[in-house]
């Protein structure tokens, strides 16, 4: 049978482990090698301490306490406190908007009775009555007038032991401190044209941003830090704030070392990453109420942006890893809403974005070290998707969100439509965020993560800003480009090739002749005959077989067989120590993994549907272990795979491992299996449907889950190539004998070929539907 190819891959998985072990032993051998390091030895051999090298930071850190500055006249910035620090009594500060506000602050020493003093305010001698009854604290008096020729009136006062005062322009008002330290507070009064109000300070002062107002209040009430009260702190002119510093640019090329032929250049670059997710939404056959798969797919995106006045053309490829499989089963009826599998990314998942642009930094990305990157986080939120049912209200999957956090960067090779490019692969870890996702009109709600159904939420792209730095070994002559090659750190990304190959494979389903397929399904396909249609296969048959087995041993099928083998081994050892096979939950637990469910069977249809669906997913393994003479689903899928490989124009040695592994997992996702007991047949499918019926009349009988599980343990499991609905339709329209019924139930290939040669439309339609399910 054609399914021999899958059996060979499963049976020979140990040879891959042995090959890896021999290879590791070879690596472990050591030799004494004398190395003569040249000027660029560190590029061939990793430095002792790997680090990012020089990464320039363009972030300006604003100090909390800026100053002290010398007395001056200037227009202070809005939302900044002027912290005034006078040494002697007298005029501290004056300011005006030259329209309707003239204000001044004077300082009075302790122990002053009411007296009239003369102050020069705005160039005019003013007589001001002042007093300070405190014996220890200095008194700041805030004065104000509204016309140039008017008289000053007292607005507020501040009794201060530290001898500090503050003033600020904010929100259309002029703010000052009042009250008494250490409990001084702020107060403000409306000032028109306040942002153009100029100040003249007659003492040293500091500048503090408003977002640090709590610190400013702390200074007003308790004094400046001790370091500010030493003679080592010298006030400077306010003009020093306008000094232009020659800072290193974020986007620059630094030559680290150079010889006649080669040089090391550090590239520091700003980067704007734009990416989008792609997905595949596949409906099952039938009446239109069921979806077989909603999954993430790699997505390419090309765009332009400006970096330091230069227009950059960039290309990204987004892919995901570590997806979580969810499903929803609304029931066993043909009109029940079902999603067999939909993918969700969450905390245990990763998102990969390959980035390349046409700048100088990517011209020689071959010999690279000290690669590092700093990227912002980005929130990805899911949108709505309507499941368009033929009749009734449509369920809607809505919501879901994840935050992407930069988790690393490495080299990779990115494939565009025309050329492969050495690029950077950014890895992002995920955290689940609000909102949760749900499916309306179902019980699926309050689940966290980002489902694949509408991950872009109708956006064109997601965007991440950041920067990266790398040191590259490049030719000293800038006109010469390093020969394109892939270093050992570069991972070959085949997703683009595989995507095109999948499209071609799925289109070839229409070109397969059913009669030839049955004949091919009966042939014992081995690895050599499977690969015989691929160009250059014979020259690399050994390495290809090894690569296929390496990939195949990581498949879900191989993992399930491995788990099943361990379970059976444990069950066998337990039986030898127990008098009853039921004491280890019987062999059913090893085959079906539902022994706990069988002990408490509910009579509801949904419960039976769930149990039979769980059992039927494991029946493929039982069928592989107990080969019968009938044809099975794997024979058909292997025959379709062989036919498509022979017809494909894009199949190659480097993508055949992915194709075979994916075919073993995804070909014919909707399968039904049956067991026969005398005249009774029990049939269950992976989508939860189940039937029990008589062979002669095809009359349905009650489905006994416990008996079905017992028969699965003791009887051969048969692929329902011609399922119950097709058999009943065939009998109602054409009439079949009891012997023909038994042969079709056993999936006898001889009888199948007879019906196909007779051009029976019901049987042909069933086989065609199976072929259409052979999709990548």
Swiss-Prot record:
Positions of the UniProt region annotated as Spike foot: 510-776
Name any Gene Ontology BP term: permeabilization of host organelle membrane involved in viral entry into host cell
Is Disulfide bond one of the keywords? yes
What ranges does the record give for the region Spike body and stalk (antigen domain), renumbered to this chain?
248-479
Question: Keyword Disulfide bond on this protein?
Answer: yes
Short sequence motif named KID motif, residue ranges: 644-646
Sorted alphabetically, which InterPro entries does this protein's record hold? ConA-like_dom_sf, Rota_A_VP4, Rota_VP4_MID, Rota_VP4_MID_sf, VP4_concanavalin-like, VP4_helical
Q: Name one GO cellular component term.
A: membrane
Q: Where is this motif: YGL motif?
A: 448-450
Task: Name the segments for region: Spike head.
Answer: 65-224
User: What are the disulphide bonds in this sequence?
Assistant: 203-216, 318-380
Q: Which residues form a coiled coil?
A: 484-511
What else does UniProt say about it?
A: In group A rotaviruses, VP4 defines the P serotype. Some rotavirus strains are neuraminidase-sensitive and require sialic acid to attach to the cell surface. Some rotavirus strains are integrin-dependent. Some rotavirus strains depend on ganglioside for their entry into the host cell. Hsp70 also seems to be involved in the entry of some strains.
Q: Which family does it belong to?
A: Belongs to the rotavirus VP4 family.
From the Swiss-Prot or TrEMBL record, give the protein name. Answer: Outer capsid protein VP4
Species per Swiss-Prot/TrEMBL record: Rotavirus A (isolate RVA/Equine/Japan/HO-5/1980/G3P[X])
Taxon lineage: Viruses, Riboviria, Orthornavirae, Duplornaviricota, Resentoviricetes
């Amino acid at each position: 049978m054609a399914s021999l190819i899958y059996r060979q891959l499963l049976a020979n998985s140990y040879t891959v482990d042995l090959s890896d072990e021999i290879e590791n032993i070879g690596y472990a051998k050591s030799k004494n090698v004398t190395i003569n390091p040249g000027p660029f030895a560190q590029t061939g051999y990793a430095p002792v301490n790997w680090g990012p090298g020089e990464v320039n930071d363009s972030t300006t850190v604003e100090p909390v306490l800026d100053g002290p500055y010398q007395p001056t006249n200037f227009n202070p910035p809005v939302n900044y406190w002027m912290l005034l620090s006078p040494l002697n009594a007298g005029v501290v500060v004056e300011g005006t908007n030259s329209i309707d506000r003239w204000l001044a602050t004077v300082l009075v020493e302790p122990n002053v009775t009411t007296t009239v003093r003369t102050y020069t305010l705005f160039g005019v001698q003013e007589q001001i009555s002042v007093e300070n009854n405190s014996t220890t604290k200095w008194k700041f008096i805030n004065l104000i007038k509204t016309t140039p020729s008017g008289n000053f009136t007292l607005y507020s006062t501040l009794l201060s032991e530290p001898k500090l005062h503050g003033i600020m322009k904010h929100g259309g008002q002029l703010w000052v401190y009042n009250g008494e330290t250490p409990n001084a507070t702020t107060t403000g009064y409306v000032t028109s044209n306040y942002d153009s109000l100029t100040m003249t300070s007659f003492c040293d002062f500091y500048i503090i941003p408003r977002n640090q107002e709590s610190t400013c209040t702390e200074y007003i009430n308790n004094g400046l830090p001790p370091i500010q009260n030493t003679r080592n702190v010298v006030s400077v002119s306010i003009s020093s704030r306008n000094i232009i510093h020659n800072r290193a640019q974020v986007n620059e090329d630094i030559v680290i070392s150079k010889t006649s032929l080669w040089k090391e250049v550090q590239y520091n670059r700003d980067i704007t990453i734009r990416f989008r997710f792609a997905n595949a939404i596949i409906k099952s056959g039938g009446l239109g109420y069921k979806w077989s798969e909603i999954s993430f797919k790699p997505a390419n995106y090309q765009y332009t942006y400006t970096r330091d006045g230069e227009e950059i053309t960039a290309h990204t490829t987004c892919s995901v890893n570590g997806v979580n499989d969810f499903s929803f089963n609304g029931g066993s009826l043909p009109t029940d809403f079902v999603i067999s599998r939909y993918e969700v990314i969450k905390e245990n998942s990763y998102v990969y974005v390959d980035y390349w642009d046409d700048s100088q930094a990517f011209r020689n990305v071959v010999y690279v070290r000290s690669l590092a990157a700093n990227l912002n986080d980005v929130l990805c939120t899911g949108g709505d998707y309507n499941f368009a049912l033929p009749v009734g209200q449509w369920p809607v999957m809505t919501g879901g969100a994840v935050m992407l956090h930069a988790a690393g960067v490495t080299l990779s090779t990115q494939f565009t439509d025309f050329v492969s490019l050495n690029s950077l692969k950014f890895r992002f870890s995920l955290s689940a965020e609000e909102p949760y996702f749900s499916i309306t009109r179902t019980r699926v709600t309050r689940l966290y993560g980002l489902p694949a159904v509408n991950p872009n939420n109708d956006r064109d792209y997601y965007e991440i800003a950041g920067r990266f730095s790398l040191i590259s070994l490049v030719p000293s002559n800038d006109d010469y480009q390093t020969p394109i090659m892939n270093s050992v750190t570069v991972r070959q990304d085949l997703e683009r090739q595989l995507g095109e190959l999948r499209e071609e494979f799925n289109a070839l389903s229409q070109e397969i002749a059913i009669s030839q397929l049955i004949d091919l399904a009966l042939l014992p396909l081995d690895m050599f005959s499977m690969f015989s249609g691929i160009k250059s296969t014979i020259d690399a048959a050994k390495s290809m077989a090894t690569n296929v087995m390496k990939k195949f041993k990581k498949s879900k099928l191989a993992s399930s067989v491995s788990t099943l083998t361990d379970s059976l081994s444990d069950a066998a050892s337990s039986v030898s120590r127990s008098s009853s096979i039921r004491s280890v939950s019987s062999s059913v637990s090893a085959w079906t993994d539902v022994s706990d469910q069988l002990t408490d069977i509910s009579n509801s249809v949904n419960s039976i549907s769930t149990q039979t669906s769980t059992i039927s997913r494991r029946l493929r393994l039982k069928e592989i272990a107990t080969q019968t003479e009938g044809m099975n689903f794997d024979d058909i899928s292997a025959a379709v795979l062989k036919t498509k490989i022979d017809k494909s124009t894009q199949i190659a040695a480097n993508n055949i491992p992915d194709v075979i592994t994916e075919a073993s997992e995804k070909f014919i996702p909707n399968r039904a299996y049956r067991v026969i007991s005398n005249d009774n047949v029990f049939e269950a499918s992976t989508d939860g449907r189940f039937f029990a019926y008589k062979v002669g009349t095809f009359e349905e009988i009650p489905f006994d889950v416990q008996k079905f599980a017992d028969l699965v343990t003791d009887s051969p499991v048969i692929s329902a190539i011609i399922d119950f609905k097709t058999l009943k339709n065939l009998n109602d329209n054409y009439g079949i004998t009891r012997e023909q019924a038994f042969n079709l139930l056993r999936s006898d290939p001889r009888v199948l070929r007879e019906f196909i040669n007779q051009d029976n439309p019901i049987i042909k339609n069933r086989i065609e539907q199976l072929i259409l399910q052979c999709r990548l």
